[in-house]
């Protein structure tokens, strides 16, 4: 009788045991992806390539957002797949809520409907030749995604401006300079195959160590603010994400470093077929590379600086540029700094492959004139030029040059001076 009961109990409970084992295996994959216990996300080996993790994303909310939470999110050179075939989400958030820096060394591919992919990790993200495929746009952020509980919309991101010693990344032995930081280390390949479709970088500490960040769409950079709002008319409630004031916190640096200062500016930087837009507040920026846009827009490269210092040691090249300097902001075009336009844009050829020949062989003093350069400078801000600025039309407030200090007497900055309308 006892044996019969034991068999019956075994039959009843065997499926449950198997299911538990299966879930445990799927919740943890090859030391690289571990799902947070509060997330319904599942990870498993890809059937075609077992070395590749396949993530079955969480169900979407009413606004098409699939919010996936992890303790670890790393991508090897084998890449990962975000399976969106069943969910059909418009936005796939991958948030690390309790883990160390995310290392992205492979391709992050969306299977099924293309989607906006967000990687969010307050302890930092390092992209080592990482790339994305079948994405509408990509967001890398050290901020916490904030979703409106009333209407399910993604409002924006909250960035930490300080960190407590109890932080897991801090305890792990990393210096404070590495916490809350986004780092890119890529090849110096200028090919037309872009790693990103439309890239958003949101962090108060950003560094391009070497190589290029290349996008066929816009490159948007946000730095210096605690709250980055992407939905107009919304606000992030301070009390909802209030920090504990009784814990001593160490301030994180607000800085953007584009390129290695000892590297070749022709072999590192940002390349976009659309616009490059940097929005920075209370930040120090160093450009040692080449910022290049092949877009026809008058604002193809746009720098919106508030209480920020921009040190340009490299190239800023486009048909049109817009520098908005406000609230004691300073733009220093250093002796090695050059602002102009790629010569090959005058040929009517918009393929970035032409820039390989251009940037490698043509000296900087033969760079073409930028078509339009707008300098919207507040009274307490200033542009100081010790390098090369070459534009056909220069737009300023009331044709005023008081906030522009040109220390190069041999350089005429513009051909025509115009008033900002």
Locations of the language-model features?
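Classical Sec-dependent N-terminal signal peptides that target proteins to the secretory pathway
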Residues: 1-23
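Solvent-exposed adhesion/ligand-recognition segments of exported proteins
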Residues: 3, 20-274, 280-281
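Beta-strand-rich extracellular passenger or scaffold domains
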Residues: 64-70, 91-94, 102-105, 124-127, ...
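Short, charged helix-to-loop "capping" segments that act as catalytic/coupling loops
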Residues: 110-113, 295-299
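Short, solvent-exposed linear patches
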Residues: 195, 217, 297, 319-321
